[in-house]
Regions:
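Mg2+-dependent prenyl diphosphate-binding active-site environment of isoprenoid biosynthetic enzymes
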Residues: 1-159, 224
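Alpha-solenoid HEAT/Armadillo repeat architecture
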Residues: 24, 146, 169, 208-209, ...
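A short structural micro-motif
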Residues: 40-41, 103-104, 167-170, 185, ...
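Non-transmembrane, amphipathic alpha-helical segments
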Residues: 60, 64-68, 92, 184, ...
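Short, charged, amphipathic alpha-helical segments
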Residues: 98, 177, 194, 217-221
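Short, contiguous acidic/charged loop-to-helix segments that flank catalytic cores in large enzymes
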Residues: 127-131, 190, 210
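Mobile late-domain/C-terminal helix-loop "cap" segments
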Residues: 155-207
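Short, amphipathic C-terminal "tail helix"
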Residues: 199, 204-206, 210-231
Length: 231
């Protein structure tokens, strides 16, 4: 089977439908939570498509983080919620673990933005610079745009921003490879990596509500994995 983005989306939809069948066996409260999660996921995808409000009420970076929480954080948070709830954890611990999952989902997506620029196809399974070529405004791109709009931008910053937003030129493999290498080496990508680490640390704080046990250790390892893959 030749996998591509369309097949991956369809596979995800199939898994989600089968999860819905499982939720139906658990009771109405779980079905309701599952439906709300799916709603958040879809609305997050719509927000991603339409983009940040043009009235300046929300900064593009804050809006992007909101999209990550709705698209990915909601899904990982739901997985944590189901596990904690079905294990009959206290309401406080259920909330803490749900927040752990949501924050970790944001960290996962931010780390993916770094991998798109600094990894290889063999390691990540993605073509480096694929997001640039598609015109996807990832966090490094948004941070560079923010820098270019400030008085602190250098001519190099402005030139690079023009390069990575010239979608016609980026269809050329050589141009894309060079633009990807330049943006990957720019400080905004290191800033993005640091933000991924910060979101992992934020997620780990929620585990303070748990006593030390093998489950907590496994969750901690899972959280660290999100940034360890950047090394």
């Amino acid at each position: 089977v030749q996998w591509n983005n369309t097949l991956a989306v369809m596979a995800g939809d199939l898994i989600f439908s089968r999860a819905s069948a499982i939720m139906a066996e658990l009771g109405s409260s779980y079905v309701s939570y599952h439906a709300r999660t799916f709603e958040r996921l879809c609305l997050g995808q719509m927000d991603d498509i339409f983009g940040a409000p043009q009235d300046g009420s929300v900064s593009p970076i804050d809006f992007y983080l909101h999209v990550l929480r709705e698209k990915t954080g909601s899904l990982i948070g739901a997985a944590a919620y189901y596990g904690a709830s079905l294990a009959h954890c206290s309401p406080e611990l259920v909330t803490a673990l749900t927040n752990f999952g949501e924050d970790l989902g944001v960290a996962f997506q931010i780390a993916d933005d770094v991998l798109d620029l600094r990894s290889t196809t063999a390691k990540s399974g993605k073509t480096p610079g694929a997001d640039l070529r598609d015109g996807t405004k990832t966090l490094p791109v948004l941070l560079l745009a923010d820098l270019v709009a400030s008085p602190y931008a250098t001519p190099h910053d402005r030139d690079l921003y023009r390069e990575i937003t010239d979608l016609d030129a980026l269809q050329d493999d050589a141009v894309l490879a060079l633009a990807t290498q330049k943006l990957g080496a720019h400080p905004v990508t290191e800033q993005t990596r640091e933000l991924a680490v910060a979101w992992v640390e934020r997620a780990l704080e929620h585990l303070d509500a748990m006593e030390e046990n093998p489950v907590k250790a496994a969750l901690r390892d899972f959280a660290h994995l999100q940034v360890n893959r950047l090394n």
